[in-house]
């Protein structure tokens, strides 16, 4: 029997990011904004680097160029250069985390401290999403991510002139 769980505020960190740590094969992340998010006491990118060292495939689609702190964290982990696949798409506004093609988060939270509930209660964003292993919802999330990943919409994109790194 599949499950669908409502996730809000700090539970993004407690329930969603805790699952990323347990990834065995693949983690696909889609976010509009990405910043120097921390998991426990380490940068999220350190977690991604450790997953890559275990042979996990990591794909990241984001809309904005990351900030300086994120880029500095990226520099500390050389495996991220060739190991983490990354695509920039200005039109991405979805927030998806798909783990091992068996569970998906779909919601409003960007991959930032405020979005994922890491900030204090007075500073974090009010976010909402669902966590599910429902086959129909999972397949829809995978298909949407994959269509952007392969550049299905690039040819006719009305923002192509602003795209610094077109997929196709």
Descriptions of predicted regions:
Residues 1-10, 31-35:
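Acidic/glycine-enriched edge-of-secondary-structure segments
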Residues 95-98, 128-130:
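Short beta-strand scaffold segments in enzyme catalytic cores
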Residues 13-81:
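Primarily the HKD phosphodiesterase
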Residues 105-168:
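Signature of lipid phosphatidyltransferase scaffolds
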Residues 9-10, 40-41, 86:
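A conditional alpha-helix N-cap/helix-loop micro-motif detector
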Residues 87-91, 123:
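Short solvent-exposed loop/turn micro-motifs enriched in small/polar/acidic residues
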Residues 62-68, 92, 135-137:
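Short beta-alpha junction loops
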